[in-house]
């Protein structure tokens, strides 16, 4: 049904230099092609075919074009749907063109409005139960202020109002939306720029997240080590402050034996329940016969040395044990 031959070779195919691409802007289409066509002024290049576009289905148009591979340009007249009406007749051979969206005004670089662009979609069948297709048309027409009517005889203008002809020329661009080759070079470049921007943003967010995660991990580790140090230091100070006291000769050996048996048989974590039980049992098994030396120095050097442990005794400052 949709026979799309080699559209780049059509009737009157222009001789263009290798690498030539025809991707005009909306302003260029209206100013340099449509307006000159309406004014009967020679065009920059004969690259747009003249055809009554509504006498064909869209899949028949590529073979009628003078130039184009994935989008095709045509000059076409427009007829009225009803005599003396202003609505255009958009019926085609096996369907119709339906306008979508709102008209887009086209301005020159001097902010002068020169034309209007309308988007249309082709529907197969008859309205209102037509089947939507992927064929799209952009229709460009001149605004009333840019129509050359001064050079035309008055009787021609009157005759035109009484005829079905609505516009002598409009410029139409046709393409199929789902064509994999539809994107032009500008759209490809724009898509690549957008992808690069998204990847860069994603990479930056990933790096920021990684840095924050590392900082959180470092902070957690530092806090864990900090509190571990507090627990260990507190335990050591408790042992030294409470149990490094003077012993009688009879009690020194028992306390040294106690430290030897309890102090060096733990290799687990401070947070382990077994360690907590051992620590409680260690407190309960401390000899009660221990005393205080007159100078506040724990006299366990000899007993600890017997068990292979040597701890340097220290004095507690500002403590008067004789008061």
UniProtKB/Swiss-Prot annotation:
<dbReference type="GO" id="GO:0043565">
    <property type="term" value="F:sequence-specific DNA binding"/>
</dbReference>
<feature type="region of interest" description="Disordered">
    <location>
        <begin position="201"/>
        <end position="223"/>
    </location>
</feature>
<dbReference type="GO" id="GO:0009793">
    <property type="term" value="P:embryo development ending in seed dormancy"/>
</dbReference>
<keyword id="KW-0805">Transcription regulation</keyword>
<dbReference type="GO" id="GO:0009831">
    <property type="term" value="P:plant-type cell wall modification involved in multidimensional cell growth"/>
</dbReference>
<dbReference type="Pfam" id="PF02365">
    <property type="entry name" value="NAM"/>
</dbReference>
<dbReference type="GO" id="GO:0010628">
    <property type="term" value="P:positive regulation of gene expression"/>
</dbReference>
<dbReference type="GO" id="GO:0003700">
    <property type="term" value="F:DNA-binding transcription factor activity"/>
</dbReference>
<dbReference type="GO" id="GO:0005634">
    <property type="term" value="C:nucleus"/>
</dbReference>
<keyword id="KW-0539">Nucleus</keyword>
<keyword id="KW-0804">Transcription</keyword>
<feature type="compositionally biased region" description="Low complexity">
    <location>
        <begin position="201"/>
        <end position="221"/>
    </location>
</feature>
<keyword id="KW-0238">DNA-binding</keyword>
<feature type="domain" description="NAC">
    <location>
        <begin position="16"/>
        <end position="177"/>
    </location>
</feature>
<comment type="function">
    <text>Transcription factor of the NAC family. May be associated with anther development and pollen production. Required for normal seed development and morphology.</text>
</comment>
<protein>
    <recommendedName>
        <fullName>NAC transcription factor 25</fullName>
    </recommendedName>
</protein>
<dbReference type="InterPro" id="IPR003441">
    <property type="entry name" value="NAC-dom"/>
</dbReference>
<feature type="DNA-binding region">
    <location>
        <begin position="114"/>
        <end position="183"/>
    </location>
</feature>
<dbReference type="InterPro" id="IPR036093">
    <property type="entry name" value="NAC_dom_sf"/>
</dbReference>
């Amino acid at each position: 049904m949709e026979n799309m031959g080699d559209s780049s070779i059509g009737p009157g195919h222009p001789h263009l230099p290798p690498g030539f691409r025809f991707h005009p802007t909306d302003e260029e289409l209206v100013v340099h092609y449509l307006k000159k066509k309406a004014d009967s002024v020679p065009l920059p290049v004969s690259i747009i075919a003249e055809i009554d576009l509504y006498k064909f289905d869209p899949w028949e148009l590529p073979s009628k074009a003078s130039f184009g591979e994935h989008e095709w340009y045509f000059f076409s007249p427009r007829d009225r749907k009803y005599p003396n009406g202003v609505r255009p007749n958009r019926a085609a051979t096996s369907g119709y063109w339906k306008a979508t969206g709102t008209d887009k005004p086209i301005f020159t670089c001097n902010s002068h409005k020169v034309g209007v662009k309308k988007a249309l979609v082709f529907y197969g069948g008859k309205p209102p139960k037509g089947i939507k297709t992927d064929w799209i048309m952009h229709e460009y027409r001149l605004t009333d202020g840019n129509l050359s009517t001064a050079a035309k005889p008055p009787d021609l203008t009157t005759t035109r109002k009484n005829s079905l002809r609505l516009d002598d020329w409009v410029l139409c661009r046709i393409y199929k939306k789902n064509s994999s080759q539809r994107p032009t070079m500008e759209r490809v470049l724009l898509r690549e720029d957008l992808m690069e921007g998204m990847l860069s943003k994603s990479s930056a967010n990933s790096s920021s997240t990684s840095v924050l995660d590392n900082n959180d991990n470092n902070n957690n580790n530092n806090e864990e080590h900090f509190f571990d140090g507090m627990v260990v230091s507190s335990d050591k100070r408790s042992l030294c402050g409470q149990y490094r006291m003077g012993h009688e000769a009879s009690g020194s050996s028992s306390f040294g034996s106690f430290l030897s048996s309890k102090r060096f048989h733990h290799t687990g974590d401070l947070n382990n329940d077994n360690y907590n039980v051992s620590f409680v049992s260690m407190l309960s098994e401390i000899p009660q016969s221990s005393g205080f030396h007159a100078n506040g120095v724990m006299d366990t050097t000899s007993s600890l040395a017997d068990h292979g442990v040597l701890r340097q005794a220290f004095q507690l400052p500002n403590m008067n044990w004789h008061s």
